Amino acid sequence: LNQPMLDHAAKMQGADDRIAWRQADALALPFTDGEFDAVVCQFGVMFFPDRIAGYGEALRVLQPGGEFHFNVWDQISANEFADVVTQTAAAIFPDDPPQFLARTPHGYYDVGLIEEELRQAGFTQIAITTVAETSTAPSAREPAVAYCQGTPLRNEIEARGGDMLDHVTAQAEAAIAERFGAGPVVGKIRGHVVTAKP
């Protein structure tokens, strides 16, 4: 999270001396050993440059009996809006398809690998639950803009032609509307919720 995001969170939270908003490197947490009874990471571990090291840091700052909770997206084919956007971008750039969504947010979904990496970091009790839900939006426009312009997919699109962002977004909107309808849209989403203990 960048500092403006944390500043916004602090503003929305309101004054509470029990909460400190600060940037930290997940691979080198600025906290003492055993400082927390829980560590929570919402859709973030897939961005760690070294997940085992990040998991090790979570373990280090946990008190005995503490818990590490996180979630990750399942594979992109189980997350319909993201999949449609990725397929649309690939059709526009067939020689060099943007793969951010498939590679990163939806690229760390193998529960066997997740468990193995947690064990390598020192966790011994691991529970992984797969959760399927639906995502809704007022129209096809919202998920198209969210994925194409509100994630690092935007950088990959712009790298292939700075003037292509609006075109890819419009094509993604059309593809979502074609598959899910022109009015309010509902698509399947699926992820894994993980709890790990020492």
Role assignments for model-derived ranges:
Residues 1-32, 38, 52-56:
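Class I SAM-dependent methyltransferase SAM/SAH-binding core
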Residues 3, 48, 52, 79, ...:
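Non-membrane alpha-helical structural segments and their capping/turn regions in soluble enzymes
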Residues 14, 49, 63, 123, ...:
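Short conserved AdoMet
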Residues 14-16, 40, 86-89, 144-147:
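Short, hinge-like loop/turn segments at secondary-structure boundaries
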Residues 3-14, 90, 115, 119, ...:
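Class I S-adenosyl-L-methionine
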Residues 26, 37-52, 72-76:
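A short SAM/SAH-binding and catalytic strip from SAM-dependent methyltransferases
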Residues 52-53, 63-138, 154:
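Conserved catalytic/acceptor-binding region of the Class I
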Residues 103-198:
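Conserved Class I S-adenosyl-L-methionine
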